[in-house]
Amino acid sequence: AKFNNAIEQVYKITDWNSTLLSDSGNIENKKNNLTNDWNFPNINRDDRLDIVTWNCEFFPTNGDLTIDALSEAVMDLYPDIIAFQEIKKRGWFSKLMQKLPDYNFVISQQSSFMDQAIIYKKDLFDLVSRKELFAEDDYFYAGRPPMQCDLIYKESNLKLSLINLHMKCCDSGLFRRKEASKMLHAYIDDETNKGNSNFIVLGDWNDDLKDDEGEHCFEPFLNDNRFFFPTLDITYDISQASYPKEPYVSFLDHILVSKSLIPNNSYDISTIPIDKYMGSFSIYEEYISDHMPVLLSF
């Protein structure tokens, strides 16, 4: 009954906070039920914000084993914010959140399939607003409209506008990614001109910054000096490929940031080698995903 209630909560159209409640109305706390099967490090830094993008391939790719492994990874790594892509089963995501009591979340309501979700620490952030961009015109996004989540960082009253996206792959993917990127740039340009300047766009762009000009979707942002890709720093380092699976080793999971948010290049960017902490890529892929999480700290 409790799990059914959790599923009902996550599907409520108006329940954007998606707070998981027990039948008594209290927040379900199952932190003590976390597994301890892996040796994940704590990457959280008290003096910085730690933000991760993570494509969790067909979540949950391995049912309860995925829930156990991913919840352990999140609570051990303990970043402040994670943007997840490729949530295949929403009810199972609510099950994951029951094991992450330190986090609140928002999840897609208008994706045709494969939702996005953003989780954030309750004690650090307040949710201001949320919306799904281009939900009425999402063809170029393959039915997965980008999800914007505006948060206030309580410590400094800083407003962050996070946009979680999962670009089209395969077939007519490049053309549609280019058009999607133009739409997104026009939207962010308009918002920035209105004074909303602290954007972080993160997710699976399904393109590599190493690709030749014209062969990727990044041009609108690369040609705008108000924004930059921290992930450009590591995209040529094959050991940090966010998609390390042969024969398509590539860097697909990028983070774009407003320069005004991170002045003087005061940030760190890295791909988290989760596969090494789990023993091998094949084990990681079996339990969680074929994409690596990418971490931005500033």
Q: Can you say where each PLM-predicted feature lies in the sequence?
A:
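Metal-dependent phosphoester-hydrolase catalytic domains
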Residues: 1-41, 90, 141, 150, ...
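N-terminal, active-site-proximal structural segment of metallo-dependent hydrolase catalytic domains
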Residues: 2-100, 104, 110-116, 136, ...
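Residues that flank catalytic or metal-binding motifs in active/ligand-binding sites
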Residues: 47-52, 113-115, 143-147, 158, ...
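Structural recognition of the beta-strand scaffold that forms the well-ordered cores
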Residues: 50-53, 80-85, 106-108, 116-120, ...
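Solvent-exposed loop/turn segments at secondary-structure junctions
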Residues: 56-61, 87-91, 110-115, 123-126, ...
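Short, solvent-exposed loop/turn and secondary-structure capping segments
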Residues: 62-64, 93-96, 129-132, 163, ...
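Structured beta-strand-rich core segments of catalytic domains in phosphoester-bond hydrolases
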Residues: 87-161, 165-167
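A long, amphipathic alpha-helix that forms part
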Residues: 174-195
